[in-house]
């Protein structure tokens, strides 16, 4: 199967200085498949993994009003430049709520450099967010662990019991 390349693909390559590598890809109009699965992405609901398993998911709106002590954004799996620019736009001109700590973990030096070059890193840091190294860290309980009994909202790909470095934390 082929997911067609589009303007988003071209923009990514341009940001990487590789726009000349863009190749339009799409399936042949007469291609035959054993099975076709069409997913209307507009019908998907945002989901969140509840403690203590990535498989323990519920619609995110069911957790509205949940107290959060800590937010960790980034990691090696969820910190593309596109995602980090969204974070910067949301934080621009705002400050982190009292009682909440926020960390940002760009997944690579390249993403960090691009954030700095375009000014987005300033917006993130001006909000009161803490910048962490481009490395394993809070995901494996190495720094920025939540408080005992705390609630941590993370964009990381794992939320197993104790993995955050705090056994009694509720990690989403």
Predicted regions and their residues:
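Fe-S-dependent hydro-lyases/dehydratases of central metabolism
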Residues: 1-172
């Amino acid at each position: 199967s082929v997911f067609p390349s589009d303007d988003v693909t071209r923009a990514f390559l341009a940001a990487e200085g590789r726009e000349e590598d863009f190749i339009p890809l799409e399936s042949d109009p007469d291609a035959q498949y054993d099975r076709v699965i069409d997913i209307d992405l507009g019908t998907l609901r945002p989901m969140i993994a509840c403690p203590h398993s990535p498989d323990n998911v519920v619609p995110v709106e069911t957790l509205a009003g949940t107290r959060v002590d800590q937010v960790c954004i980034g990691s090696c799996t969820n910190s593309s430049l596109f995602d980090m620019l969204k974070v910067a736009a949301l934080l621009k001109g705002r400050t982190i709520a009292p009682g909440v700590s926020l960390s940002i973990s760009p997944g690579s030096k390249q993403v960090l450099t691009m954030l700095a070059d375009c000014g987005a890193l300033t917006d993130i840091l001006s909000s009161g967010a803490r910048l962490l190294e481009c490395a394993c860290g809070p995901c494996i309980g190495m720094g920025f662990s939540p408080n005992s009994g705390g609630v941590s909202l993370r964009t990381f790909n794992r939320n197993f019991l104790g993995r955050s470095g705090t056994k009694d934390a509720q990690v989403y």
